[in-house]
């Protein structure tokens, strides 16, 4: 997986954290196409190609997802469970990015099918350094699965 061909869906409800993550990714040298969704409902709409995300040229299928756990209107675990139950989304790598270090949250995330669990550092420099390592692993060393094309014809009922 190469960064310039990689679309990352950032599912995060805090607009300040969205900006912070995008800036840290850029400063880490990762030229990813970042799309964001501020809720579980928006992420589901993005993944299934519902309006306003129907244009796949503008809203490509993500190669990976950075997912917050605690959001209003549904948790990251809810989205992850939904994704893993669907043929068209189950192979998309999901990396939890949460401020929670609670072992119960970590265990629930892995039980639901996350591929990695990262704890958001408080300091920006530490976040940037985390994304340098993230990029090396996910974009240089990891061999990604083939993802099904998600189109309106492959969308399964929720």
How does the language model describe each region?
Residues 52, 77-90:
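Short amphipathic alpha-helix used as the core "switch/output" element in two-component signaling
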Residues 72, 102:
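The feature encodes the CheY-like receiver
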Residues 5-16, 21-26, 65:
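Conserved acidic segment of CheY-like receiver
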Residues 42, 122-134, 142-148:
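C-terminal output helix
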Residues 67-69, 98:
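Active-site residues of response regulator receiver
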Residues 39, 60-63, 75-78:
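Acidic catalytic/metal-coordinating carboxylates
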């Amino acid at each position: 997986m190469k960064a310039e061909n990689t679309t990352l869906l950032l599912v995060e409800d805090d607009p300040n954290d969205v900006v912070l993550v995008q800036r840290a990714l850029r400063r880490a040298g990762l030229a990813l196409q970042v799309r964001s969704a501020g809720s579980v409902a928006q992420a589901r709409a993005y993944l299934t190609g519902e309006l306003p995300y129907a244009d796949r040229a503008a809203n490509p299928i993500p190669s990976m997802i950075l997912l917050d756990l605690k959001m209003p209107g549904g948790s990251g675990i809810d989205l992850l469970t939904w994704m893993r139950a669907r043929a068209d989304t189950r192979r998309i790598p999901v990396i939890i990015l949460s401020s929670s270090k609670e072992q119960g949250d970590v265990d629930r995330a892995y039980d639901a099918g996350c591929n990695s669990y990262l704890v958001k550092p408080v300091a920006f420099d530490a976040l940037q350094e985390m994304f340098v390592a993230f990029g090396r692993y996910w974009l240089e060393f990891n061999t990604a699965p083939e993802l099904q094309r998600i189109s309106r014809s492959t969308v399964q009922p929720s």
